[in-house]
Amino acid sequence: MQEEIVVSRTAAGPACEDASRGNVLDAALTLPLHQAISLLCDTVDLDERVDAHPDWSQRLLSRVRSELGKALEQRDEQALAEVHGALFALYDLHTCDGTEPRAINQFNPTLTQVRRHIERAWLDSEGRRLAVAAPAAPDGRSIAEAIKRMWSQHAVVSHPLFDFLEKEASREQIVAFFRSDSALNLRFFDLLLYAMIGARSEARTELAQNLWDEAGRGDAAQSHVNLFQHLLNVVGVGPADDNHASVLGWEGLAGHNQFMLACVNRAHYFKLLGVMAITELLDPAQYEKLVNGCKRVGLGSEGELSYYDEHITIDVVHGDGWLTNVITPIVDQSPAIAGDILFGAAWRLSSCDAYYSALHARLLALPILHGQAA
């Protein structure tokens, strides 16, 4: 397995020490790519530095293209980790708190060029790999049915990770699952907000209901972010500045990046609808197995499983709602976007499968503490 990428807010290492003495641009050409991009994101005077060295941007982009070749053509594990770690840092600029100095670089031209290079190459690679074709004359109902077939027939529906969590995993392994699940779960409110931007009027009621449920239906303590944070506190994980993204391998980072790519690029908005639909369809049955496993190892007495219990029940409704009230009317209005929705669905199924397989292997490799085996 590739080295895990630490997507920290501050890059580290000798080259970064040089950068602190003024050699930021030079350091960015020698650091591992994810550290280089994190360093640039944190450089508040990046515009001025790049303006003073007009040839530097092309050198950085050449380096990015080289890393992309290794990652997407050669499927080099470390290069995949570098690319997705860099992309994660770039997307963090779009959701970071406005008081953070790095927020000034949200639309930095050089960083935007890097992001667009990675996005185009990744989408092109995934498009060739998945080869999703839209029907010649799509209508909303047929696309909704196609998504349900894709979901029900995909191997990820019965992924062995969740059988393992239900029947065999130790408490330590289940807690490691929670930690790995953190970055996306704690970001999901923002992702739903992105889905509401520019939404068709027919879809707004369903999207608003999803957001209302995510926000706790008026009770802040029941918001999904707070429910999940309560779970982390009870099991001793607690909060982290990066929402524990530092534990993710490239597969986990790619799953997060998949959402963000479709969120921040209006041209890919309809891919987001397919990604979201699959997420709502997958969660209930898998989370039911997870909750069974949690209770098997003694969790649940402090209400800490409410986050997953909630998704077992409401995501059944949300899954049908996404298909019937969001995707169906939108495809009926604009049949040409059916291909993007189907691609998003297939893409999410594939990324979940890869992430679950990598996480399953990592959990199996954890040492089981004495007395923790089921």
PLM region spans:
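Non-heme di-metal
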Residues: Q2-A374
